Amino acid sequence: MERLELPFELRQKSRLRARLASGEEVRLMLARGTVMRGGDVVTTIDGREVEIVAAKEKLLHIESDHLARVAYHLGNRHVPVQVGHGFLRIAEDHVLEDLALQLGARVSHIQAPFEPEAGAYGHHHE
């Protein structure tokens, strides 16, 4: 099965033209509101199945003894947040990095796949 590596920004699009690892162009037309996750299998317009790979992105990895407080403040800014066991991840942003540091968090710059929460009313794609 072919694989299609995409950053989070492109995995949110319902209409997409992209290139497979082989260099071949494919087109996707998904239901509005669909967010593709790493490991999802989608069908291209021409009927082929393609596995979605979450691309590595520049992220802020945030740890804190008061993680709920940091999450609350990030949530007030309506930014996508990946919630893990003992950490939060957000796209690199110097303003939000400063905010997290002011709240006493430990922040590191990493490159990793970004899989933020879908939200209370987000579409869950299986």
Task: Locate the predicted segments by residue.
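Helix-rich terminal scaffold detector
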Residues: M1, L10-K13, L20-S22, I90-E126
